[in-house]
């Protein structure tokens, strides 16, 4: 240490401390929030039809949106990734009109992205990811095409479903499309 301090002054001591795993900076107790939320699954069988693929995507959207709501945040960017049986992965993303944590809204965007992305190859892995996450509540820009959509009602319904699942388990309440489907669980991941 003394030789380094003699030649490099204060920097010599810092270099010696770093080289020996010593750090005098304060430990930050507050952790950074998540920058994104996502979920993906490797499917036990090759998915060759759009219906099954969209069921898996719905299941992934359920878990991602529930995690967003649990942390009281909304995401502005949604992305989908698809890996085929040859292990080739492709993905697309889209910026939403407004940040959201509503399952149906995320799922609708995911379906559009999937339709743009999938070329019909057998699917082995699917993923849904969100980013540009924020806590602040921004106003939603009204659209002529959304006049009949009650986002507040959809959000309250999703939160009620979350409470039921938290109290009674993930299978206590599920979408009807999962009832007869033995291949895909209602909450994947």
Identify the meaning behind each predicted range.
Residues 96-189:
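Acidic, metal-coordinating catalytic segment for phosphate/diphosphate chemistry
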Residues 1-122:
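DNA-contacting surface of Y-family translesion DNA polymerases
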């Amino acid at each position: 240490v003394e030789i380094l301090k003699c030649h490099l002054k204060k920097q010599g001591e810092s270099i010696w401390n770093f080289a020996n795993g010593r750090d005098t900076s304060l430990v930050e107790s507050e952790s950074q929030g998540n920058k994104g939320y996502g979920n993906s699954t490797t499917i036990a069988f090759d998915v060759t039809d759009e219906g099954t693929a969209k069921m898996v995507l719905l299941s992934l959207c359920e878990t991602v949106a529930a995690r967003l709501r649990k942390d009281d945040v909304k995401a502005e960017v949604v992305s989908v990734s698809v890996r085929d049986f040859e292990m080739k992965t492709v993905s697309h993303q889209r910026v939403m009109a407004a940040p959201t944590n509503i399952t149906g809204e995320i799922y609708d965007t995911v379906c559009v992205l999937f339709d743009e992305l999938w070329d019909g190859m057998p699917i082995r892995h699917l993923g849904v990811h969100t980013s540009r996450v924020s806590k602040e509540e921004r106003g939603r820009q009204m659209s002529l095409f959304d006049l009949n959509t009650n986002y507040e009602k959809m959000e309250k319904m999703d939160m009620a479903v979350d409470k039921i699942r938290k109290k009674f388990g993930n299978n206590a309440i599920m979408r009807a499309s999962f009832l007869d489907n033995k291949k895909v669980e209602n909450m994947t991941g």
